[in-house]
Amino acid sequence: MDDIETRVRKLVAARFGVEECDIRLDSDFRNDFGAESLEVVELVMALEAEFGVEIADDDAERIETVRQAIDYLEEAVPT
């Protein structure tokens, strides 16, 4: 099974139409990929489905970069 970072990168690439090689850990969903608020919400929903977790609205609002998504999931996903 792919690790969390690899899975997040694949989801981000698919959601925002970018190449995985162009995704940096500090890539900002809005500023670097031009994502609108709804697109970020859809990404959060995809992350929830992919990893089988529920991301609280307050937490979701703080996930703005690839690294923040990975860090959150590393804490939330049971090992």
From Swiss-Prot:
Annotated transmembrane regions: none
Pathway: Lipid metabolism; fatty acid biosynthesis
UniProt key word Phosphoprotein: yes
SMART domains: PKS_PP
PTM field: 4'-phosphopantetheine is transferred from CoA to a specific serine of apo-ACP by AcpS. This modification is essential for activity because fatty acids are bound in thioester linkage to the sulfhydryl of the prosthetic group.
Entry-linked InterPro entries: ACP, ACP-like_sf, PKS_PP-bd, PP-bd_ACP, Ppantetheine_attach_site
Gene Ontology molecular function: acyl binding; acyl carrier activity; phosphopantetheine binding
UniProt feature coiled coil, ranges: none
Presence of the UniProt keyword Magnesium in the record: no
Similarity annotation: Belongs to the acyl carrier protein (ACP) family.
NCBIfam families membership: acyl_carrier, PRK00982.1-2, PRK00982.1-4
Reported function: Carrier of the growing fatty acid chain in fatty acid biosynthesis.
Entry protein name: Acyl carrier protein 2
Organism: Pseudomonas aeruginosa (strain ATCC 15692 / DSM 22644 / CIP 104116 / JCM 14847 / LMG 12228 / 1C / PRS 101 / PAO1)
